């Protein structure tokens, strides 16, 4: 049996502007990103000027969460980016507030956020503090009441994601 795997297509022209690559996968964690065998190879093909990491909430939801392991994994991910693209700017977006089973605040959310802030300082990365922008622990409930978060108290609605994008764009610009 013959197989074919398409890992991506890059189409472009000579016009200046922004080229956007998204490598998001629902449920991804630092551990799953480190398990990607071609991450460095793929990053070397696109040579980004800016890499935005917005991962952490899935790590925080892990019942076997370890702050030390999370920090080691995230540190290794940043290291992979720096190895392949030492001149790329790196922006860390902190985790959002969320709940487990719609009832229990994710107790590791603050530890994940603190780890990101430490790593940003260590590696000279920018930080956009989504957790703080949302309002901290419990804020996802307010976002849900305003139609910005889904009933699972983890994910956002289209309006919520749009607002997050607008707020992040405003902060960067």
Model-identified regions with their sequence ranges:
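Conserved N-terminal glycine/acidic-rich loop preference
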Residues: 47-60, 68-84, 91-130
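Residue-level recognition of the N-termini of beta-strands and the immediately preceding loop/turn
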Residues: 18, 88-90
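A mature extracytoplasmic/lumenal domain signature
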Residues: 10, 24, 94-96, 132
């Amino acid at each position: 049996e013959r197989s074919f795997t398409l890992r991506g297509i890059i189409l472009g022209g000579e016009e200046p502007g922004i080229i956007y690559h998204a490598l998001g996968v629902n449920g991804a964690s630092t551990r799953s990103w480190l398990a990607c065998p071609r991450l460095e190879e793929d990053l070397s093909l696109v040579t980004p000027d800016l890499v935005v990491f917005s991962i952490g909430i899935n790590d925080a939801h892990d019942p076997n969460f370890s702050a030390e392991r999370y920090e080691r994994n995230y540190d290794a991910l940043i290291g992979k980016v720096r190895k392949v693209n030492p001149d790329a700017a790196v922006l860390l977006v902190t985790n959002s507030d969320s709940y487990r089973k719609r009832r229990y605040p994710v107790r590791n959310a603050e530890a994940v956020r603190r780890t990101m802030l430490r790593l940003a300082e260590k590696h000279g990365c920018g930080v956009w503090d989504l957790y703080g922008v949302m309002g901290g622990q419990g804020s996802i409930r307010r976002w849900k009441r305003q139609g910005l978060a889904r009933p699972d108290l983890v994910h956002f609605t289209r309006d919520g994601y749009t607002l997050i994008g607008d707020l992040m764009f405003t902060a960067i610009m």
